[in-house]
Every structure is written in structure tokens, then in C-alpha cells.
Amino acid sequence: MYQPDFPPVPFRLGLYPVVDSVAWIERLLEAGVRTLQLRIKDRRDSEVEDDVIAAIALGRRYHARLFINDYWQLAIKHQAYGVHLGQEDLETTDLSAIRQAGLRLGVSTHDDMEIDVALAARPSYIALGHVFPTQTKQMPSAPQGLEQLARHIQRLADYPTVAIGGISLEKAPGVLATGVGSIAVVSAITQAADWRAATDQLLALAGAGDE
């Protein structure tokens, strides 16, 4: 039963692009995306704070669900919609501070054991990956494939879920057929020959999420 310790999110978050710049955030919001994540890696808080502020302001302007990856203290300081954390971040993050600030929490998982860890934290949503091989990020685990993804979805029942990892426009229908509430994409948009057309097609498949 879905009883998160953090503010809830809709079961269907829809198309969920993960991007590394404010420019991409703005483009995608203008294109109709309403769930997205700013993921900037390996920089100090002071180096990313201006980007976080700008991204949060854009998210508010478009009434979007903007998650900040990793920089949870900045997300709290500037009142983001939510924070997304990897498994390795759970132990070093003050989850109670995120909860008390009223931010939503998403957590990455890669297998059943990590799903157990995520469920213990009772986040707003659980990300399941990586579904297919991906070049975007070095992954220590093997791709899960659609069969494993479907099993996780069945196990999590009414918990909001996000599939991530190697999801292309061609593979998106099969991923969505598992019943997952959202698909997170990176290169399917940012490396597309025509990013706007790719975004439109992915939105047509996955939707922009429930209100």
C-alpha cells in the first residue's frame, strides 16, 4: 500500500527527462514536459547553486514536478518540488530534513535488495533501472530487461514507479506495457537528431503525468 513518508506524487509521472542543464529544462518545459530532473554531477554546491535556483524557478513557472538530483541541501534551501537520490546517497543524506521541508523524494534501485532499502525509506516514488544497456552512466549492475521490470512493478503494486536506463523511442512502448508509471529518458531526447520531435513522440506515448 502506498503510504510514503514524504509528500506523495501521482502514480503516473509520465515522461521524465533527466538533463544536466537549465537550458534543457527550459526547452523541455516549453515543449510540454511536466516531470523532469536536473542531474549535474561532480560539482560543489557553490558551483551549481545558480543552476538549481534557475531550474526551480522555471519549474514553478510551468507548474512542473522538478526534481534535483543529489544536491538535497540546495533543493531544501530553494524549495524544489523534490529530490532524487541514488542508493549510495541514502546513508549520507538527512532524510528527515527533506521530509520536514515538504519535498518529495525519489530513490534509485537496481535489484530486489535495493528495492527493500528504498521501501524502508518510504519515498514518494521508486526508480527501477537500468532496464537496457546505457552509455549515459557507468553501471555496476546488469540490465534488468522487461521481464524483471514487470516483476518489480507487480511487487510494488500501487507505488509510483519510474523506469530508467537505455529507454529509446523504439523501446518505450514495451517499457510502458509493464504498467510502470513513468519512463525516464536521457539520450533519447538530448542526442536525438530532432529533440523536439522525439519529445513530442515520447509525450504521446507516456503522457505528461497525472495532476
Curated annotation (Swiss-Prot):
Which terms in the Gene Ontology molecular function aspect does this entry carry? magnesium ion binding; thiamine-phosphate diphosphorylase activity
Catalysed reaction(s) here are: 2-[(2R,5Z)-2-carboxy-4-methylthiazol-5(2H)-ylidene]ethyl phosphate + 4-amino-2-methyl-5-(diphosphooxymethyl)pyrimidine + 2 H(+) = thiamine phosphate + CO2 + diphosphate; 2-(2-carboxy-4-methylthiazol-5-yl)ethyl phosphate + 4-amino-2-methyl-5-(diphosphooxymethyl)pyrimidine + 2 H(+) = thiamine phosphate + CO2 + diphosphate; 4-methyl-5-(2-phosphooxyethyl)-thiazole + 4-amino-2-methyl-5-(diphosphooxymethyl)pyrimidine + H(+) = thiamine phosphate + diphosphate
Q: Per the record, a Pfam family?
A: TMP-TENI
Residues that coordinate or bind 4-amino-2-methyl-5-(diphosphooxymethyl)pyrimidine: 37-41, 69, 108, 137
Q: In which pathway does it act?
A: Cofactor biosynthesis; thiamine diphosphate biosynthesis; thiamine phosphate from 4-amino-2-methyl-5-diphosphomethylpyrimidine and 4-methyl-5-(2-phosphoethyl)-thiazole: step 1/1
E.C. code? 2.5.1.3
Could you list this entry's UniProt keywords, alphabetically sorted.
Answer: Magnesium, Metal-binding, Thiamine biosynthesis, Transferase
Q: Tell me which residues bind 2-[(2R,5Z)-2-carboxy-4-methylthiazol-5(2H)-ylidene]ethyl phosphate.
A: 134-136, 166, 186-187
Residues that, per the record, bind Mg(2+): 70, 89
This protein's record includes keyword Chaperone: no
Gene Ontology, cellular component aspect? cytoplasm
Cofactor binding: number and manner: Binds 1 Mg(2+) ion per subunit.
GO BP annotations of the record are: thiamine biosynthetic process; thiamine diphosphate biosynthetic process
- Transferase as a keyword of this entry, yes or no, is yes
Q: What span is annotated as the signal peptide, if there is one?
A: none
List required co-factors.
Mg(2+)
UniProt family annotation = Belongs to the thiamine-phosphate synthase family.
For this protein, the record's HAMAP family field holds: TMP_synthase
Q: What does this protein do?
A: Condenses 4-methyl-5-(beta-hydroxyethyl)thiazole monophosphate (THZ-P) and 2-methyl-4-amino-5-hydroxymethyl pyrimidine pyrophosphate (HMP-PP) to form thiamine monophosphate (TMP).
Official protein name in the record: Thiamine-phosphate synthase
